[in-house]
Amino acid sequence: MACPWQFLFKIKSQKVDLATELDINNNVGKFYQPPSSPVTQDDPKRHSPGKHGNESPQPLTGTVKTSPESLSKLDAPPSACPRHVRIKNWGSGVTFQDTLHQKAKGDLSCKSKSCLASIMNPKSLTIGPRDKPTPPDELLPQAIEFVNQYYGSFKEAKIEEHLARVEAVTKEIETTGTYQLTGDELIFATKQAWRNAPRCIGRIQWSNLQVFDARSCSTAQEMFEHICRHVRYATNNGNIRSAITVFPQRSDGKHDFRVWNAQLIRYAGYQMPDGSIRGDPANVEFTQLCIDLGWKPKYGRFDVLPLVLQADGRDPELFEIPPDLVLEVPMEHPRYEWFRELELKWYALPAVANMLLEVGGLEFPGCPFNGWYMGTEVGVRDFCDAQRYNILEEVGRRMGLETHKVASLWKDRAVVEINVAVLHSFQKQNVTIMDHHSAAESFMKYMQNEYRSRGGCPADWIWLVPPISGSITPVFHQEMLNYVLSPFYYYQVEPWKTHVWQDERRRPQRREIRFKVLVKAVFFASVLMHKAMASRVRATILFATETGRSETLAQDLGALFSCAFNPKVLCMDQYQLSHLEEEQLLLVVTSTFGNGDSPGNGEKLKKSLLMLKELTNTFRYAVFGLGSSMYPQFCAFAHDIDQKLSQLGASQLAPTGEGDELSGQEEAFRSWAVQTFKAACETFDVSGKHHIEIPKLYTSNVTWDPQHYRLVQDSEPLDLNKALSSMHAKHVFTMRLKSQQNLQSPKSSRTTLLVELSCEGSQAPSYLPGEHLGVFPCNQPALVQGILERVVDGPAPHQPVRLETLCENGSYWVKDKRLPPCSLSQALTYFLDITTPPTQLLLRKLAQLATEEAEKQRLETLCQPSDYNKWKFTNSPTFLEVLEEFPSLRVSASFLLSQLPILKPRYYSISSSRDLTPTEIHLTVAVLTYRTRDGQGPLHHGVCSTWLSSLKPQDPVPCFVRSASGFQLPEDRSRPCILIGPGTGIAPFRSFWQQRLHEAEHKGLQGGRMTLVFGCRRPEEDHLYWEEMLEMARKGVLHEVHTAYSRLPDQPKVYVQDILRQRLAGEVLRVLHEEQGHLYVCGDVRMARDVARTLKQLMATALSLNEEQVEDYFFQLKNQKRYHEDIFGAVFPYEVKKDGAAGLPSNPRAPGAHRS
């Protein structure tokens, strides 16, 4: 028989630690005194340790032969201070000294030159399968160590019982090769393993674990019954109780009892045919395994997976969890009613099922256990992780946050509200949950207790710091020491990857590949792919963007060209112009900014490219431009690049494409991309070019299929602000009309309004002078009613409905996210654009709805570019006029809700200072009316301007503030400014002079010279804010006011650029060149172009600059943010007609900065 005493009485040398400072452990150099309070046998804490609770009794030095009396020395303290590691809390300054780590079992994964602390499942925390029993000589010392630890946990030594148990375990191992834990030992081991778990933040409850001993079960059915008992006990109608069920221990590794599920309760994740995932993406692989084993999928978002149980090493069996055992919590928010519409829920019981309990050399591969949720586990990880349900962006949109701007911190705001909803929902249902702040504080208390009681606390900082709130939780500032003690809960390899199937017919069809084989296959495939890509023609795709739209399309283009080429997508500011000499194929996707300029990240390339004189490499190229046809310089930057590359000798692969944001931009891009791709395949003679399968994005069906849409009645009342916030990712608030005043005289045939809006609260939303107010208008009731009268088979106009679409495989319906549930009347009034002429794509779909063949053919003809442009420019029809022109169209409500474009907000420069009028926002609005067909057509109205003009006092106005960081007053108020703004271009300058007036009168701050250049037709007709300008000049806010009149009788027309040339040449030089001042231009884009041309002429003359130098001079002004432009497109049809040759807009109702 092996001698147990060699493991019980190990000779140890003690090293003296000369540390002199005391710490919170309060145990350096002190003797151990066990607590005097008795603990009864029934107390759940009867195995709670004293100071050395996790340590085995101190061994005696000397010979093996000893008397039982000498065992009393097992509890004696060491003769000197033990070695320790000092850790510090950087928030409180408190230090701990860890000695418990000397009892650590084995090494962690860290190496001298690398740290593996952030690895999810490191090898050091994972135990794999076995194919034979643990050898007795390995098992015995671990068993004795555990027995020592167990008996060392009692308040009073039980020496005789201790020795007897050591003898019994030793004999049992020698006889059978293993041993069995007693019931009390099992309880102690499971609790101690929880206590030792470094990644658990809730260990303060470790001694309250309920242990269910299921070591006697032998079948999967018995396992299922034990698990049902566990779930029922732990759930406890929502008052969650921590529990563990322990199945038989591992013998030879071939008869394991295992739960194949990662958790007892988890939701299925289905890989859909279109590549999307329905349900929980984390469980896709396991869900497919269940399906392969015979489970019938339900294809819902929250389907509880069956239990997959393996008994005695046999093939696993499936068991459906009785629904009454699964307590689920529906999610709602205490303030946001729409949160219920997300239709979220979560199960109440977090029960980990796939870990292994190691104790005394024994392994229990089946030991499901549970605690209760910390809110962030659900609210952050389950709902917000990109690889999980990923609801963050949808919530951000519904909250009205700016989800397109990371710097707006929309993610942080949204994730907090999601966690508020989770906590609120659990608490409302009386289901146990703990917020992460309370959890962190409880862990700090637990950690302090552990250091006092046993001199250490293994802790993994990466796992314990909650996924939100970071440094405002105390655990963030706490240094931690991570190590593995025994007993311990280890990770395991997924059982389906290692299971030896007894019935090959039940083996899942999709066999797993061994990791080494997989690595080799991946490496080999990557080598082949690298060689294949290297042999392909290289294609460089450049983009320049202000909003990110061009980048998105460039990435889509890269996906298309990767089917046959070796593409690389780059931003223009990352591209080295010298690489043009090496290019084979260059593709450019870019927007145009301002007055025909490049976006900011394209300026560098533009300047270098325009200066390039020659190119020896003759490559192929193609360009696609994005923009708005409301601007005369539509896609100008794209055409500039095209022209320059052609001049340098490059060969155009395909005509330059144009994407108009007002008219089917995406359709235009897809068409151009496919045309360009095919041309490239032909030009470079790509192998198999006629059989290449291109991405689905470029092959989507452009026809209307009514079977894919349906309307469902909905009772949810419409909250307009919340709906608009969600749809447009803006923070929409309500202002109310205070007053409106016509700024033009009664002699004028036009109307320009000063619209004063008052806030509903005590103070208007925050904004700065020069920023914009986005306004959500309503469509005219006459247009809405006219369309409603022509809808076929539609619901009642005021019946709330929601649009649902059929998934691609046709197995279920999903709620369309484009529009909120609302009535058809509300959709046409608030959400859908019914005044912009239909795109060619929409006309093609309408052609399917025509019952008269002649009308159908006419609609199909209008889909051709030449016919379409003529029809659109001449008629500029609203959707109602299209229905009137083609009366045989049978348009359904689902067609309207799914196919009409979204009504966009209209932007107006704010004409007031928040400091001067803190409860108001003022706008300057030109009211637009016109007739099409050379004045012979129907009367059209600007959508937003006409709506604003029709409002009555206290009527609501949904709106939001849009920042304009490039058009604000100088930070140094002493800098001189020149303000140029004819017509409604005066709007932001009114906010400028009001701000300066407030600073002068209330703060005593004087600003630099401010010169205003205004333009209008006649002084007695349309000189906007004339009296206010005079008042500002009298008070010294405006130092000079110059007005250009363009319609004085018997006088030549004078424009603002003429004033600059004739009166202010010297002032321009002083402000821009000598005094480092600022110049602001606001108004029509053609005016801004003429002003820029005049200013360049003035500066070139004054500074003797050539054309290239003056361009660079103004480029530098813009870079220094001293030349500011806030411009909008021409919106009046007679202006369009007059300047049609210059490429002015064909859509007269496109939103401008101040007119719509």
From Swiss-Prot:
Annotated binding of L-arginine, by residue: 263, 372-373, 377
Q: Which superkingdom does the taxonomy of this entry point to?
A: Eukaryota
* Residues carrying Phosphotyrosine: 575
The reaction(s) this protein catalyses: 2 L-arginine + 3 NADPH + 4 O2 + H(+) = 2 L-citrulline + 2 nitric oxide + 3 NADP(+) + 4 H2O
Provide the protein name.
Nitric oxide synthase, inducible
Which residues hold Zn(2+)? 110, 115
Q: Write out the transmembrane intervals.
A: none
In its record, the post-translational modification comment is: Polyubiquitinated; mediated by SPSB1, SPSB2 and SPSB4, leading to proteasomal degradation.
The UniProt annotation places FMN binding at: 545-547, 549-550, 591-592, 628, 635, 661, 665
The protein's job, in short, is: Produces nitric oxide (NO) which is a messenger molecule with diverse functions throughout the body. In macrophages, NO mediates tumoricidal and bactericidal actions. Also has nitrosylase activity and mediates cysteine S-nitrosylation of cytoplasmic target proteins such PTGS2/COX2. As component of the iNOS-S100A8/9 transnitrosylase complex involved in the selective inflammatory stimulus-dependent S-nitrosylation of GAPDH implicated in regulation of the GAIT complex activity and probably multiple targets including ANXA5, EZR, MSN and VIM.
